[in-house]
Design a protein with these regions (language model features):
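Register position in tetratricopeptide repeats
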Residues: 38, 72, 106-107, 136, ...
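Residue-level recognition of tetratricopeptide repeat
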Residues: 34, 68, 102-105, 136
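A conserved acidic beta->alpha catalytic loop
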Residues: 189-199, 205, 216
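Catalytic-site signature of metal-activated, phosphate-bearing donor transferases
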Residues: 222-225, 249-416
């Protein structure tokens, strides 16, 4: 994520910008800030745009780039001021209007965002993203009016998880997350053929599980979207996680104790730690959290990836398996505002909450995982990943037993 900003001289390459159309300037600006990482440091972007303005003049494209960087830096008021000025110059530019709506949403300004979405849709009536986000915002606003003063939430903290052939470790996963504070599990089974159903039925608290068996082209995105649409008013918080992810508090006894410190925040970014195989060829006899104790180093690229704990009644649109667009601003575990991009944050924090991502497990389990594919719809060309993707993540550099403070109680629960 420490992407270097190129030299300013590389931006214009000797061309007079006044002779270029706006689209070409925009392309050059995008190339100037290009990189494989989606979220370079926003303060560096802001500084570089200001330097470009000083050297080349006040182009609208520079202003838009600066507003985008201010959004990444969570200076939504600063971004909004620039975008409002751009709207005066380009009242029918749906790109500018959309960015303004995003700034308003992050400020919690629902009515302002509603008005901007209407203008954006007038400029781009066929945009599926705009239509979906506008409809989601209306649902959030209507629910807030409909249920004012009424608490219909049955659960404090629920997990939403898409599963397939996870019978080996699912019982441990359920017991573990109940132990750290989860009240309910919304499980979407995408056509399991192993003992997954029997494992779920063996869980001693069946009332804690809502189970959906779906087949074919259902996939994770549709599962999570269904959960949001169906259960958005049933839980105070929902964590959207996978069956190989163990979310827990590093110090507190209960995740809800950490969430209580965050006040009315609508969404929390919780970061991965990626664990390797510990050299196991076959599935070990012990529990997952006691068998896989070695992980990648802190600066491993996947450790910038986050998952979300969200107040589901604030979700405007489900953007990505790792994040949602919400009414309000994401925060880190300590309440620091953050604007994730593509499920990543530049400065991950893990002193209070963390996700141990047991991605590879043993080689035997890794091969099974690759065979069943990603939680995507059948026929998706991205469903089966190359073997190299897995082997690159089998990192065992650091011994980390933080999660094992829950091990004695977890064993008691599993053993009955």
């Amino acid at each position: 994520l420490d992407m270097e900003i190129p030299a300013l001289s590389s931006f214009s390459s000797g061309v007079n910008l006044d002779t270029l159309p706006a689209s070409e300037i925009e392309t050059r600006l995008r190339d100037f800030f290009s990189g494989r990482i989606a979220n370079p440091k926003p303060d560096e972007l802001i500084q570089s745009v200001e330097q470009l303005e000083q050297q080349y003049g006040r182009y609208k494209e520079f202003q838009f780039a600066k507003a985008a960087a201010l959004v990444q830096a969570c200076d939504f008021a600063g971004a909004r001021a620039i975008l409002l000025d751009l709207v005066k110059q380009m009242p029918s530019d749906s790109r500018v209007l959309h960015r303004l709506a995003i700034a308003d949403l992050n400020m919690g300004a629902a009515h302002e965002a509603q008005d901007v979405y209407l203008s954006a849709l007038a400029a781009a009536p066929k945009s599926e993203n705009l239509r979906r986000e506008f409809a989601g915002l209306l649902r959030v606003m209507e629910a807030k009016k409909l249920y004012v003063g009424i608490d219909r939430k049955k659960h404090g903290l629920a997990a939403v998880c898409a599963i397939k052939n996870e019978g080996d470790d699912l019982l441990e996963w359920l017991h573990f997350h109940r132990l750290v504070g989860f009240d309910h599990f919304y499980l979407y089974d995408n056509g399991s053929t192993d003992n997954t159903r029997a494992v779920i039925e063996s869980f001693p608290w069946p009332e804690m599980i809502t189970y959906h068996f779906v087949e074919g082209e259902f996939g994770q995105m549709r599962a999570f979207s269904h959960a949001i649409d169906t259960y958005r008013n049933c839980a105070e918080w929902c964590a959207f996680i996978d069956a190989d992810e163990y979310l827990f508090p590093t110090q507190a006894g209960n995740i809800k104790d950490v969430l209580a410190e965050l006040g009315p925040a609508p969404a929390v970014a919780v970061h991965w730690l990626n664990f390797g195989s510990n050299g196991h060829e076959a599935r070990p006899a012990g529990l997952c959290i006691e068998s896989f104790t070695r992980r990648a180093p802190d600066d491993f690229p996947d450790h910038f990836i986050m998952k979300s704990i969200v107040r589901p009644d604030t979700i405007v649109s489900y953007l990505h398996p790792h994040q949602s667009l919400v009414l309000g601003c994401y925060v880190q575990e300590d309440g620091t505002p953050v604007f994730p991009i593509g499920g990543r944050c530049t400065a991950p924090k893990r002193s209070k909450l963390v996700i141990n991502h047991f991605y590879t497990k043993s080689r035997e389990q890794l091969l099974k995982k690759r065979e069943r594919g990603r939680p995507l719809a059948d026929g998706d060309p991205e469903k089966i990943r190359a073997m190299e993707f897995f082997t690159l993540r089998d990192r065992n550099d650091v011994e980390d037993a933080t999660i094992q403070r829950f091990l004695p109680e977890l064993k008691k629960l599993i053993q009955g």
